[in-house]
Regions:
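Beta1/beta-strand and adjacent pyrophosphate-binding region of the FAD-binding site
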Residues: 2-14, 30
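Short hydrophobic core segments
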Residues: 6-9, 183, 190-203
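Active-site substrate-recognition segment that forms the wall
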Residues: 14-24, 47, 83-88, 194, ...
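Glycine-rich FAD pyrophosphate-binding loop
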Residues: 23-43
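Short loop/edge segments at beta-strand edges and connector loops
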Residues: 33, 115, 149, 165-168, ...
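Dinucleotide-binding Rossmann-like beta1-alpha1 core, especially the glycine-rich loop
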Residues: 47-126, 132
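Helix-loop-beta segment of a Rossmann-like dinucleotide-binding subdomain
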Residues: 83-93, 114-159, 255-260
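A conserved short coil-to-beta-strand element within the FAD-binding core of flavoproteins
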Residues: 163-181
């Protein structure tokens, strides 16, 4: 019977990252995936590695450390895999959407806020307005989210990890006196020491809606257009963004829909995304819609204690 230090349920970006760094630290890893790696949001996300704009110092430290790991993997992934994550360094222009956001950002970024539309239009001529100002970040990267997820997974496999296709249920785990002992499928049994359920918005459902796992699904839709127009920067405002990716398509998003697991793209979302984009930009008269995607990401459930 095979023995593993860690069972990982789900091979999205979190599961694949965990598999990579665990394997790198000489842990024996078993990954269980129901579909294929990058099946949902981990393979369809915009892939922007944007700066942390909040005020929580611990969250900022975590973000900074994560960004450093991205920079490291960008330089070293070829040591582990042939799957290129396609990191792309570019400039990010974040447009401040409200007076409240500006006040919040002033605490940490006041010195970087620029209110000069003419100056900003020299960088991105197609912008119509900058609302309450912008912050320009030169240290910014985008990545192909599908490739990154598969690059990390493939790296872990090349270091000895194993992946199996299985629709995991919590009943697949066996315990001995409340201590985790093994994981079983219909055909195999594996001895395991630890388990990590990294199934995004499905995590709570898999874990039998455990109250300690307070995640829920949030649907996001995005549009991909062919255009002859140059667009060298990544622009974000509110929850929305526009960026031209390495596939030479203009990616525009996004929605944040609290609709549980209601699947599918909608015309309403398409109109909403385009309206937001057209309010911000001029001179995109040749947009040709190539793709419209919808996927689920996870967000925290807000629990009120009465």
């Amino acid at each position: 019977m095979e023995k593993y230090d860690l069972l990982i349920v789900g091979s999205g970006i979190v599961g694949s990252s965990l598999a990579f760094y665990s394997s790198k630290n000489n842990k024996k890893v078993l990954i269980v995936e129901k579909n294929f790696t990058g099946f949902n949001s981990s393979g369809n996300a915009q892939g922007g590695l944007a700066p942390y704009l909040g005020t929580d110092n611990s969250a900022k430290k975590l973000h900074d450390n994560s960004y450093s790991l991205h920079k490291e993997f960008k330089e070293t992934f070829r040591n582990y895999t042939e799957v290129n994550p396609n990191y792309n360094e570019k400039r990010l222009i974040h447009i401040i959407d409200s007076a409240e956001e500006k006040e919040l950002l002033s605490n940490n970024f006041g010195y970087k806020i620029n209110n000069d539309l003419d100056f900003v239009k020299n960088i991105e001529p197609k912008l119509k307005k900058i609302n309450h100002g912008v912050i320009i970040f030169d240290d910014y990267m985008e990545v192909d989210s599908f490739n990154l997820t598969n690059s990390l997974l493939n790296s872990s496999l090349n270091m000895g990890a194993k992946i199996i296709t299985h629709d995991f249920k919590i009943e697949n785990l066996q315990f001995n006196k409340n201590k985790l002992e093994s994981f079983s499928t219909k055909d195999e049994r594996f001895l395991i020491k630890n388990v990590a359920i990294t199934a995004g918005p499905w995590t709570s459902e898999i874990a039998k809606n455990n109250d300690h796992i307070n995640v829920k699904p949030l649907k996001g839709q995005l549009l991909k257009f062919k255009t002859s127009q140059k667009f060298n920067n990544s622009i974000s405002w509110g929850k929305d963004y526009a960026t031209k990716k390495k596939d030479d398509l203009l990616w525009i998003g996004t929605t944040e829909e609290d609709v549980k697991f209601s699947e599918g793209k909608t015309e309403e979302a398409k109109v909403k995304i385009l309206n937001s984009f057209n309010k911000m930009f001029n001179d995109f008269g040749d947009l040709n819609l190539i793709d419209h995607t919808a996927c689920f990401r996870h967000t925290l459930k807000i629990i009120f204690l009465l």
